[in-house]
Regions:
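Glycan-recognition patch characteristic of GH18 chitinases/ENGases
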Residues: 79-185, 318, 350, 416-429
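Active-site and adjacent substrate-binding regions of carbohydrate-active enzymes
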Residues: 173, 182, 186, 194-230, ...
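Glycan-binding loop/region signatures in secreted carbohydrate-active enzymes
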Residues: 106-107, 126-127, 263, 301, ...
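A structural motif corresponding to the C-terminal end of an alpha-helix
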Residues: 140-152, 187-190, 218-222, 248, ...
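Structural recognition of alpha->loop->beta junctions
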Residues: 102-112, 169-197, 239-259
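Substrate-binding surface in catalytic domains of secreted glycosidases
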Residues: 86, 119-136, 197-341
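Ser/Thr-rich, Pro/Gly/Ala-heavy low-complexity intrinsically disordered linkers and tails
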Residues: 1-2, 6-12, 16-80
Length: 430
């Protein structure tokens, strides 16, 4: 931060102002400071382009900002005892989780989602908000992360961006795209990039590897992470690409949530079962981890996923491992947030814990709640304790959260508003 300020990057004044405002906000449930994202000046047009003929001074500014972040990261090693919890903060869910309320004790990295690649190698920086408020939110998040000794990561892509990734990383646009990514990191003060290419089709493997190789060469000090899919044991994927990517990446995080559905041949199942799968319930965290390990990905590079949302099955299903009949998934990510589940569905009578799968669920005899659920699969403190114990026992790198916004209980007492992040702190980081 200090060296970046000295070289006069255009975005730093807003970042530093927010950092000062949030410097004492480490306990996420403390009273918020004055101001917030709305008080931070913008500084991006939401779609900046990188000029390949940019001046040497601009290039040096980018490099100097990278050096500054490298210096700052030297003090991060003790956070989490070498393990990580990276939480995704979705711009479109900003109202659900104020910046000043973030529970930093449960995080080592905050991934700001999403910057959208364009096929021509440029970026949409609006974060699903607009060209002014999106960048302002990003600057507030970066400042708050750094004020609390955590890393801020720019997440690129997301679901539905496959064609754009293919275009941006083609041989004719790759260099410009990497230039744009370097500029994004420098402009906002990010510590690195999360490369969310979904899906990675078999035909994409060569382009993905060439892109990540070039990106690592251009940004040797940056934190580079990549989320990847879970494994369906009935139809396992070729994971050989990830053993080649592992030396280039700091984290390979498995999106082991939302791993169930009303699919032909399936029974009802948990969103994120830790253990146990059979042909009718062919997903679990454990089976996905084993597949990536078998493909040659080092355990210390692997993170597992925790969804701060649930799945709602309609009746007649009322529990896991049941025949589906006419049941469907009627609500999931974005609607069935942990916050919504706790206020609209959770009761002591409805809650059960599947010890074999290490997963909680809610069971109802008839359609219940706003979505008419018969069976709700979700994460809670007990399942996250089991998941964290598994991470440690297997020597894995850590965990990711999709999304931290959905786990915030705004009406709970101070100190109890981010219980899932607190649970991950205890189980993964301590």
């Amino acid at each position: 931060m200090t060296r970046a300020t000295a070289i006069g990057l255009g975005s730093v004044s807003g970042v530093m102002a927010m950092a000062l405002a949030l410097a004492t906000s480490c306990g996420g449930d403390e009273a918020p400071p004055q101001g917030g994202a709305g008080s931070i000046d913008g500084g991006s047009d939401g779609g900046a382009r990188f000029d390949g003929s940019a001046s040497l001074d601009a290039s040096r500014a980018i490099d100097a900002a990278s050096d500054a972040r490298t210096d700052a990261r030297a003090g991060d090693a003790s956070v989490g005892n070498g393990r990580w919890v990276m939480g995704y903060y979705a711009g479109y869910e900003r109202d659900a989780y104020p910046v000043a309320a973030i529970e930093w004790s449960g995080l080592t990295h905050l991934a700001v989602a999403f910057y959208l690649p364009r096929a021509d190698g440029t970026l949409d920086e609006s974060l699903f908000i607009d060209a002014t408020s999106g960048p302002a939110l990003a600057r507030a998040l970066v400042a708050a992360a750094h004020a609390n000794g955590r890393k801020a990561i720019a997440s690129i892509g997301g679901a539905g961006m496959h064609a754009q990734w293919v275009g941006a990383t083609s041989s004719g646009t790759r260099a410009a795209f990497i230039g744009n990514l370097r500029k994004l990191v420098a402009d906002y003060g990010y510590d690195g990039l999360d490369l969310d290419w979904e899906p990675v089709d078999p035909a994409d493997a060569g382009a993905v590897l060439a892109f990540v190789q070039a990106l690592r060469a251009a940004m040797p000090a940056a934190t580079l992470t990549m989320p990847t899919g879970y494994i369906n044991a009935n139809a396992p994927d070729d994971l050989s690409l990830y053993s080649k990517l592992a030396p280039l990446l700091d984290q390979i995080n498995l999106m082991t949530y939302g791993m169930a559905g009303a699919y032909t041949g399936w029974k009802s199942w948990h969103s994120s079962a830790l253990h146990q799968q059979d042909p009718a319930t062919p997903t679990s965290v454990e089976s996905s981890v084993k597949a990536y390990l078998a493909a040659g990905v080092p355990a210390a590079k692997i993170g597992v996923g925790a969804g701060f949302y649930g799945l709602c099955y309609s009746p007649p299903v009322s529990a896991p491992m049941q025949a589906l009949g006419a049941s469907t998934i009627v609500a999931d990510d974005g609607t069935m947030s942990f916050a919504h589940i706790t206020t609209s569905y959770l009761t002591p009578q409805a809650r059960h814990y599947d010890v074999a799968a290490a997963a909680p669920y809610l069971s109802f005899a008839s359609a219940t709640g706003p979505q008419g659920c018969g069976f709700v699969s979700y994460e809670d403190e007990q399942s996250l304790a089991d998941k964290g114990a598994y991470v440690k026992a297997q020597g894995l790198g850590g965990a990711i959260v999709w999304t931290v916004n959905q786990g915030y209980l705004a009406s709970a007492p101070l100190g109890a508003r981010s219980p899932l992040l607190v649970a991950l702190r205890k189980s993964v980081l301590e």
